């Protein structure tokens, strides 16, 4: 699965997004 980092450095995984 692809992993991206949002502007806060939180890992965004395919099918499960994590935010603070």
From Swiss-Prot:
Activity unaffected from pH 1-10. Loses 34% of its activity after 2 hours at pH >12 and 65% of its activity after 4 hours at pH >12. Keywords: Disulfide bond, Protease inhibitor, Serine protease inhibitor. Disulfide bonds: none annotated. One of its GO terms (molecular function) is serine-type endopeptidase inhibitor activity. Coiled coil: none annotated. Retains over 90% of its activity after incubation at between 25 and 55 degrees Celsius for 1 hour. Competitively inhibits trypsin stoichiometrically at the molar ratio of 1:1. Also inhibits chymotrypsin. Belongs to the protease inhibitor I3 (leguminous Kunitz-type inhibitor) family. Heterodimer of an alpha and a beta chain linked by a disulfide bond. This is Trypsin inhibitor AeTI.
């Amino acid at each position: 699965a692809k992993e991206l980092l949002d502007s806060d450095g939180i890992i965004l995984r395919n099918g499960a997004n994590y935010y603070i």
